[in-house]
Amino acid sequence: MGSSLNKPLSDRVEDINNQSSMIYDPWRHRGDVNSTYHSSSSVTHRRRNHRLSPLEKQKMKNIQSLNFSVNDNLLQREEYEKTTKGLHLKKTFGKWIICLFLGVIVGCIAYVIKMVVQLLQGLKFHYTNHYVSNGLQGEAFLTFLGINLLFVFLSCLMVIVAGPLASSSGIPEVKGILNGVKVREALGFRALLGKIVSLVLSFSSGLFVGPEGPMIHIGSAVGAAISQFKSSTMGFYPSLFLSYRNDRDKRDFISIGAATGLAAAFGAPIGGVLFSIEEVSSFWSRQLTWRTFFTCVIAAFTTNFLLQGIGSSPDMHDTGLLTFGFSRLYLFRYSELLCFCFLGLIGGLLGAFFVFLNIHLNKWRKEKLKQNPYLRLFEALFVSVVTSVVCYYASFIFDCRYQSNIVIETSVCEDQSNTEMVQFFCPDGMYSELGSLLFGNPDQALRRLYSRTNNMFTLPPLLVFTLISLFFSIWSSGLWVAGGLFVPMMMVGAGFGRLFGQTISMWFTNIDSSIYALVGSAAMMAGYCRMTVCIVVIMVELTEGTQYLVPIILAVMISKWVGDFFNESVYEHLMEQKSIPFLQSKPPHSTNNIRISDVMSKNVVVLPEVCQVRLLVNILNSNNHNAFPVINSGPYDNQRLYRGIILRDHILVLLFYRVFYRGTGEEIYLDENFDFDKFTTETSKSPPPLSEMNFDQFELDSFIDLRPYMNSSGVTIHNTFSFVEAYKLFRNMGLRHLPVIDINNEVVGMVTRNDLF
Amino acid sequence: MGSSLNKPLSDRVEDINNQSSMIYDPWRHRGDVNSTYHSSSSVTHRRRNHRLSPLEKQKMKNIQSLNFSVNDNLLQREEYEKTTKGLHLKKTFGKWIICLFLGVIVGCIAYVIKMVVQLLQGLKFHYTNHYVSNGLQGEAFLTFLGINLLFVFLSCLMVIVAGPLASSSGIPEVKGILNGVKVREALGFRALLGKIVSLVLSFSSGLFVGPEGPMIHIGSAVGAAISQFKSSTMGFYPSLFLSYRNDRDKRDFISIGAATGLAAAFGAPIGGVLFSIEEVSSFWSRQLTWRTFFTCVIAAFTTNFLLQGIGSSPDMHDTGLLTFGFSRLYLFRYSELLCFCFLGLIGGLLGAFFVFLNIHLNKWRKEKLKQNPYLRLFEALFVSVVTSVVCYYASFIFDCRYQSNIVIETSVCEDQSNTEMVQFFCPDGMYSELGSLLFGNPDQALRRLYSRTNNMFTLPPLLVFTLISLFFSIWSSGLWVAGGLFVPMMMVGAGFGRLFGQTISMWFTNIDSSIYALVGSAAMMAGYCRMTVCIVVIMVELTEGTQYLVPIILAVMISKWVGDFFNESVYEHLMEQKSIPFLQSKPPHSTNNIRISDVMSKNVVVLPEVCQVRLLVNILNSNNHNAFPVINSGPYDNQRLYRGIILRDHILVLLFYRVFYRGTGEEIYLDENFDFDKFTTETSKSPPPLSEMNFDQFELDSFIDLRPYMNSSGVTIHNTFSFVEAYKLFRNMGLRHLPVIDINNEVVGMVTRNDLF
């Protein structure tokens, strides 16, 4: 409901704000102290007062909310009387079936992505290594660069074709949708397909992007798609999924999908559930925990099952897109906890630094490059060229080392493949340190960084690696290619962690720098996205051991605290940049002394219970409000007593199907041809546009009875409410419209997301 | 607000139900179909229609709710205007400090309990084994029995002294409190102390009880105590903790405390967080996740640190009250998943069976033994005798086995102490199988059951052990001693799991029965308490490995489904037995076609905004309602227009301090001596009883202005609401009173927990 965009039409509708002035208002007992210094526009509501430009503000104002409340009208109530226990069971059972399919599909997608990436990277390194092994530096580089550029070009092209929603990780959009913000087409089929293809190509291209963020978006999109199972383009609306075709059930499936995407990507089902609880979801229930867990397990199991195949080995082991065989025998000392705290501090600082630079870079991009596909394509290609050059030529800075330098400790039962290093242009029996980290898959680099073998790397290459990966992570995030931040951040963290571990091992004995790498990764992740439990669990699930729980937890905590001192998580900032009015679970303290009557939209357009079609059409045409309180004029005829609320879309459907009132007096007449099923089916589609409905004179003179179709259980508040309490009510109940009534039950205002944000 | 217990006094207050009869009611359009077949008493609301006896119903009706909403009155608003950012920061910082202390204290309690139990059990077995090694069966048994009886006697005595709230696990009470039910003294100092002592003694006595459930209760009690930091008996109310002294903040600390108790008991911080999210807490927020996690880590770390000591070994490893060195090398095959499903099925069946028998046994206890301490004490001693006899003499059923039969596989790097068996009365070099399981600590028995060594036990002793432990778990739960169910259930599960594993290993090769024991434990736990993610995480944290995630998850899921088919979780049933009106997150389907006007209490007692003391005292004396809507009589004087709501306790404080109205007309006069601090301090204490206030005639003729003290942001609903939507609003917002208004904003009803349950 836009704020006072239009004057109401109906003659019954008048500004009655002054009408109740003789009634005691608990805010105004001391003159007009409050009424002056809070104007409606000065509501700053974020924990940190971000300054939004007028354009950004306007953009946010235009964003609509999703409709999480049940439309509890007469039809619904009649339907309830008919529904048996069997139907409820059927609906619940159907949800489990959808979850099963969701898990299997997301698992398969994760498998396909992993396989195709493996294939593409294999091809790239196959051709490049052909020249490398022949010692042809120039040719090798050109091949490397050429293939990378091709991948980035195609990846960026996919984004241009499928729209910018296919780029980046998509987590801010998912978070916004789960908070109740309508982000158009974010979970559409085009964005889904574009993201999958773009992700495969960008991840193969050697850019510093990871697959996890996009997998979360992909999971959410699959969840939205499979639960709705309709197509507006194809006009395909099967009735089987009708009962799930509302924003509320859709939200639950999107929550599940997001968790599932992460679970499949990391092979971490518990981590997935916690990610959904802690980070993306705004509404949660116990039932959802259980269903999400089920779906995550199915997805992780599917990926795992496909990766191993059933024929080759009957043993099973759970692996995800990224798993490390981490050693389990070493224990650390109490005194080392101080070092882990230090790693947490570094992680928090670097994380906050990352967020700062990334956000400013994205702002610059938004201003300079805008949505221009040529500039965006050029930028992506440019980043790719620089990345390729640096990754290729950085290896030449340092001398080659002898493979025989690496001594594997006997106490470690480690996967030996981790220690295979990259020879690059080194003589036989020697290896290139930076080449082993930069010239290959990120997975392999991470495995090497997490390796137990302490003397694998020297300090300078680790430092250079950390700086390079930090720099390119910042630069690559926000390009018009699909890509997440988890893996790049883990690389940065593992880099500085191992660097630190090896540094202090010069003074102290028995330091295992692999733990430091692990802890560094966790700290870095906590530093940029400010999650806690979720990161700890993911790290535990990745490394398959709980021995390092205490150091990881310590580092994550400190990192989060340090990061929070400087700025908010990268998702919060990105949501703001993308004009997604996200409502935090609590309003900021600065709103404590605002009253709801200061911020509510005062010129509410209301509809009478029985309304002439002519009037209705005029009212609908004259504004763009999405909901209208339905009023009863009461015994004194100039009143507008609140009775219920009805959505514009529902009125449009009623008008389109000519559900006119044929009764008399106060009796309610229900159209036989327009029962609950019909109403639900039609309102779940996109509503017909008003302009295409042509009413003849007779129809315009008819009446529509809104009472059977309005929501009689809509939450309202009195105008004595404080902002804070109204916010909590709005946020906790997931409302879209919150009518404000006065002492006489007359509608005096309307609160929507835009008034609260 | 009890339902229509008294007739209202005020002359303005009349039954105005018929007044709005000419106004359209969306429920009544088809005659009086609805109005007849829903009477107020027929609301059955549980998923399964439990039949409550009239006495039980009456008991539940008398139970009050906690007050989670902010009392947003004029004083509060004035206070907000004064509060600076620094004060908010101070409050947040204070919460972290409280969490830190909470973690340390709970960790220390867990350590003390573990140490004392170790000492007591050590003494017991020291004296018993003295006779055992001399071959004196009779003397050994009498010593064993005598010490067990002494422990049980003292443990039961503690419960008799401290009240029945110190018995059992206390999880239902904590769950109820977190849902908003006022369970008197459940978290009091007496219950806390009684529970700690009783737990130590009962756990040492060889009864089939575990320490985890009580630890959760202890954690919650510590959380409540430390955050409130007051004593009503000692009249000690420091102002430092004033801002946390409300039900809302207390609830959060209790949630954290419950998680922390579990985390300290199991050494499983993530499991603790998930337990709080999944099982006990009804209200959760993202901030809470983070704070709970911090506290859990602190507690687990404290216990761990104390157990290991800093001097002896500089290495650290995380262990809780119960940890197993589980082997990590073995992988299972896909075909075995079927077996794990079967274990899930068994776990679900046994779990449901356990719940069924336990509930009926408790019902029998409640009817026959009542609260009679002698009977209760006798019962506990009787169970102890039978347990001691069975645990002691069962070992003689089976022949001794040669210690040399146990072959430790070389591939396993296991803690060798696990395989040390109990010799009991066997010749040297031999051991008693049942003695190793029943004659010793539960921890040791569990360790042996989870041991990798396959040929440690034969099938018949395992079967007998499973049956014995199932039988005694059922019998012991509900005795008047403190004790939980986690460990006994794990033992049952491990028993049948290992039994099953060893049985099928007769036909198939390479079966590791230790995995089966682990999976069996998980299945059994899921079968009786119906948790999912939490159990999986606890098992992972206990065994320190994620390799067996898939089997555990599979078994837990199937077990939960199977169990849910038969009955609800043991906590749901116990809450009902304890007359705790717990509100599930969703109302049951059977309430779909009830309207809120059918169930609301119709004879609401209202108060005018400015009220004569005489009238007020009369009204307060004439009923036991806890809140009163404050009304304005409007321009037509016989109306009762809703303006706000005020609690009885707050009125009592106002009366006690003679905060009388001295103004005139509509102007509001605030008493200078009764500001926000004073109001908060006084209302956070127990209110003075009305009977002790003696008013003189002048005072009785005075007026009280309720407007500055009433809650102006109280949520209300219209009488057109459906039961389901009102329930959701009430439950999600954690309300205590929900006034119902009609089309004229007149108060026509009141909804409280008792109307919804």
Curated annotation (Swiss-Prot), chains A, B:
Residues 1-96 are cytoplasmic. It is found in: Membrane. Keywords: CBS domain, Chloride, Chloride channel, Ion channel, Ion transport, Membrane, Repeat, Transmembrane, Transmembrane helix, Transport, Voltage-gated channel. SMART domains: CBS (SM00116). It is a multi-pass membrane protein. Coiled coil: none annotated. The chain crosses the membrane at residues 97-117, 141-161, 196-216, 253-273, 292-312, 337-357, 378-398, 462-482, 484-504, 506-526, 535-555. Residues 600-667, 710-757 form the CBS domain. GO terms for cellular component: chloride channel complex; intracellular membrane-bounded organelle. GO terms for molecular function: chloride channel activity; chloride transmembrane transporter activity. Pfam families: CBS, Voltage_CLC. It comes from the Eukaryota. Gene3D superfamilies: CBS-domain, Clc chloride channel. Voltage-gated chloride channel. Chloride channels may have several functions including the regulation of cell volume, membrane potential stabilization and signal transduction. Belongs to the chloride channel (TC 2.A.49) family. This is Chloride channel protein C. It comes from Dictyostelium discoideum (Social amoeba).
